[in-house]
Curated annotation (Swiss-Prot):
Organism field: Shewanella sp. (strain MR-4)
Keywords: ATP-binding, Cytoplasm, Glycolysis, Kinase, Nucleotide-binding, Transferase
Lineage: Bacteria, Pseudomonadati, Pseudomonadota, Gammaproteobacteria, Alteromonadales
Catalytic activity: (2R)-3-phosphoglycerate + ATP = (2R)-3-phospho-glyceroyl phosphate + ADP
Intracellular or extracellular location(s): Cytoplasm
Protein residues bound to substrate: D21, L22, N23, R36, H59, L60, G61, R62, R113, R146
Protein name: Phosphoglycerate kinase
Length: 391
């Protein structure tokens, strides 16, 4: 079943409603990280170039559903888009019963989560949204894993439902990385907890040639290998699970390497003193916050030989520079690699920005949870809806 692409449609004079993922951090009314906004611009610009009257909607943050809260208003996003686009951009706060929008203009709807029924994919709300447009464009890969009114229901009731260029690119890149990858396929999975990424680790361990774990996840694997992890964040109840994943990888001729050296401190703080230790020398009072240089070099070598690289999650607490060298080395190795590389997840994108490698990564995914669910092998509800409407 083919998905209809926005780029193939005649949008002249049409009311086009685009669901983007504009969920960006805002501080004192100003957007502090604009990666998702930048990613959405080509879609909005294409709709304008095709002669459409453009409406854009998104969620921002986690407000109480159905209640207006100025802290989660889309106004800072409107201010950003007004500077980035060469046209009128305005905010519509009361839009469900109809909104005036002219060709060549962009109207941004107030936070979709201010609407009661958004998260439950309420049918009445979905139909009201669908009635606002001639063409609905799903372009928010970051929320494609949620069946909500603005990402799923509206598409079922709109006259035409299609994928925007950003979503189409995401699906193509992920397919290239996982469906028919150039091998060896190396996956780097970081983050704080095994429990949140267990299904990802299980799914990937069956298809990758080499699985690398980092961050708090690695601590559980270090403990599973019989080493002391001191006061580090780890999950004792998942040690057997970690052992099983390692055994599975080894039975396929791969491995999940455990760091040989680590960077530790006595407290979690931006000023904590970093100490390098062999992994078997971690004391009861230590907390592991990064991999050491030997481990980082070993991982860099694995990355150098890869044909395809999937990166989701840092290997240390890179927000603090003294615990960022491991992630920095991984980032450099990915940047230097000739392999097809795809990076996704909020913390990963922050690392890509910090180490300035965005132009060296083949594809940067805007999705967090959606990226993970795709890695788990699940069909995303928004994609299922688009396939249904394209049939």
């Amino acid at each position: 079943m083919a998905i209809i692409n926005m780029s193939d449609l005649d949008l002249q004079g049409k009311r086009v409603l685009i669901r983007e993922d504009l969920n960006v951090p805002v501080s004192n009314g100003v957007v502090t990280s604009d990666a998702r906004l930048r990613a959405s611009l080509p879609t909005i610009e294409l709709a304008l170039a095709k002669g459409a009257a453009v409406m854009v909607m998104s969620h921002l943050g986690r407000p109480t559903e159905g209640e207006y809260n100025s802290e989660f208003s889309m106004q800072p996003v409107v201010d950003y888009l007004a500077k980035a686009l060469s046209c009128t951009v305005r905010l519509a706060t009361d839009y469900l019963d109809g909104v005036e929008v002219a060709v060549g203009e962009v109207v941004v709807f107030e936070n979709v989560r201010f609407n009661k029924g958004e998260k439950k994919n309420d049918e009445a709300l979905s139909k009201k949204m669908a009635a606002l447009c001639d063409v609905y464009v799903m372009d928010a890969f970051g929320t494609a894993h949620r069946a909500e009114a603005s990402t799923n229901g509206v598409g079922l009731h709109a006259p035409i439902a299609c994928a925007g260029p950003l979503l189409a690119q995401e699906l193509e890149a992920l397919g290239k990385a996982l469906d028919n990858p150039a091998r060896p396929l190396v996956a780097i999975v970081g983050g704080s907890k095994v429990s949140t990424k267990l299904t990802v680790l299980e799914s990937l361990s069956g298809i990758v040639d080499q699985l690398v774990v980092g961050g708090g996840i690695a601590n559980t694997f270090i403990a599973a290998a019989g080493h002391n992890v001191g006061k580090s964040l780890y999950e004792a109840d998942l040690i057997d699970e970690a052992k099983r994943l390692v055994a599975n990888a080894q039975s396929r001729g791969g491995d999940i390497p455990v760091p040989t050296d680590v960077v530790v401190a006595g407290e979690f703080s931006p000023t904590a003193a970093a100490t390098l230790k062999a992994v078997n020398e971690v004391a009861d009072s230590d907390m592991i916050f990064d991999i050491g240089p030997d481990s980082a070099e070993a991982l860099a070598k694995i990355i150098e030989s890869a044909g395809t690289i999937v990166w989701n999650g840092p290997v240390g607490v890179f927000e603090f520079d003294q615990f960022g060298e491991g992630t920095k080395r991984i980032a450099q190795a990915i940047a230097d690699s000739k392999a097809f590389s795809i990076a996704g997840g909020g913390d990963t994108l922050a690392a890509v920005d910090k180490y300035d490698i965005a132009d060296k990564v083949s594809y940067i995914s805007t999705g967090g949870g959606a990226f993970l669910e795709f890695l788990e092998g699940k069909e995303l509800p928004a994609v299922a809806m688009l396939k249904q409407r394209g049939a």
